[in-house]
Amino acid sequence: MAAARACIVALALVAALFVAGSAAAAAGNAGGRPQLSLRQRRRQLLRQRQVRSHLKRLNKAPLATIESPDGDIIDCVHISNQPALDHPFLKNHTVQMRPAYHPEGLYDDESKVASQRNAQTITQMWHQNGRCPEGTIPIRRTKEEDVLRASSVRRYGKKKRRSAPNPMSVDPDMLNESGHQHAIAYVEGDKYYGAKATINVWQPKIEQANEFSLSQLWILGGSFGQDLNSIEAGWQVSPDLYGDNNTRLFTYWTSDAYQATGCYNLLCSGFIQINNQIAMGASIFPTSSYSGSQYDISILIWKDPKEGNWWMQFGKDYVLGYWPSFLFSYLADSASMVEWGGEVVNSQADGVHTSTQMGSGHFPEEGFGRASYFKGVQVVDSSNNLGAPRGGLGTFTEQSSCYDVQSGSNADWGTYFYYGGPGRSSSCQ
């Protein structure tokens, strides 16, 4: 009898545990949330640890912090504590605070640009709430949600492969398979030591969060296979990278065709910033409006003939910093091609072309105030002279019915081109 009574008690206990477990499972599934398996929970915890470790490497201790009206947090980090100096080859690097040489003819060109009528002032949004002190650089703080939007921690802040357009390609359809489309002007066939342009600034509409639209210049060396070297700068709208649709200043570099090396802005060791006024990846404003005010930014990238580093200047006042020459193989000497223009990601959701806009979202033939442009397009030659490309510009686009480009030259703008388009339309499916 005692044994039977013990058996009944044991069965009751098992039943109670089963009911409690079922109730807990039901509570866990409230709202339709599926229960994670032990393996899934471990994977989730591992990713969280990886993200937090990555954030710790990227977000250096600031001496001051500025909250931007657009939600960004700008950390003012001591110049000697910036992410670039984490690179093993830069552990004992003495930061070069100014280039040994600027290109010849630069200031003649800027005097001409400054005297043009209807010049509009453009700035960064965080400036409304303060500036970083001397001896620091402004760094846009990376948030946990920024990293979580990436396909992996390792790929955060990196472009997809085959992102640089190859105008020599005989098979545009093959380029379309990469999901990237372009409308560019270019020069090739010589040695180039820099490039400059004034870029019209817009806020193009993005259809899918995993797409982007940018306008930039590319300094290129090597082949379009596994060893491409590229230095890039311009403006972009990229919800996946930044979490919003703001127009932002950006830089990029790679020494292996976007495979393992390089990144946007200061999201890895590479670009050494010296300027305390301009933040890479921060919003720029105002932007141009259709048939309204037009706003431009000017970008110059050149190779210092003495030190060999590649420098970047924003506008006529801000020398931002440099990419050390050791980061590159081909670009350690010179560039073999320079490109300027627009790029979008076409994810082809539902099997149709994206409606993500390039430039202003309007075709080149609409002209000033409606179509986006690059003007004052120049290159730096082997004598460190800045001037118009000899022989003019080549142009390239994969699908001119979606995004197009038209180049020209005149006394006011020098070498220029209009570019862009709406993406999906009656003529672009």
Give names to the regions the model predicted:
Residues A2-Q429:
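Exposed, interaction-prone regions of secreted/extracellular proteins
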